[in-house]
Amino acid sequence: MKIGLFIPCYVDALYPEVGVATYKLLKSLALDVDYPLNQTCCGQPMANAGFEKMADNIASRFDQLFDAYDYVVAPSASCAAFVKLYHPRLVKEGHQCLTSKKIMDVVEFLHDVVKPTSLKSKFPHIVSVHNSCHGVRELGLSSPSERNVPQFNKIVDLLRLVDGITICQPERKDECCGFGGMFSVEEPDVSTRMGEDKITRHIATGAEYVTGPDSSCLMHMQGIAKREKKPIKFIHVVQILAAGL
């Protein structure tokens, strides 16, 4: 199978190490990975801000760029969910959106498609798992606590393959961190308070690191923690899965 690697714009600009780790991890599993150099944003910021026509053009270009691949894999539950759920509506007129059926977050792809039974990675640290809203409620990376369904967590399942790691989950484990894209801009006080509450619960686990599938959530909490000098660090889950490669 041929995999097209989609690196979201904020990962490319602010956390390129996450993109590199994703590529290294997929290659270490003997997968055929290609990174299209002329890729751009998926259009989520524009759509969320109300500029739907601008997002429409970007979505159409995205679909054309990644059309040739069997899977499109991204280290971002948020962006993967946007392409999967909203691109078909954006490009519906006279065009069938194909990438929406192919795109997967890297956690989802590894857990559901590749299904590794072992990894070469090592991460001898205590880690608290952050379940992002998009990951839980749009991609099904873990079971939402408000539903009476069997409990599962694909992030935790993959982290258990890492040598030396200790995995924790905070109280109210799938409550929002307060980022929410434009929400953090339009409601900064509420967003910050939600982030503070989430960080407090992660610290209460005794963890050294907070990890999750969305750099945007981690960035939000990291900014608050740094400003308030909180004793905890942040790392994308794919960096842990690729640690030592």
Map each language-model feature to its residues.
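Iron-sulfur cluster-binding electron-transfer modules in prokaryotic oxidoreductases
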Residues: 1-245
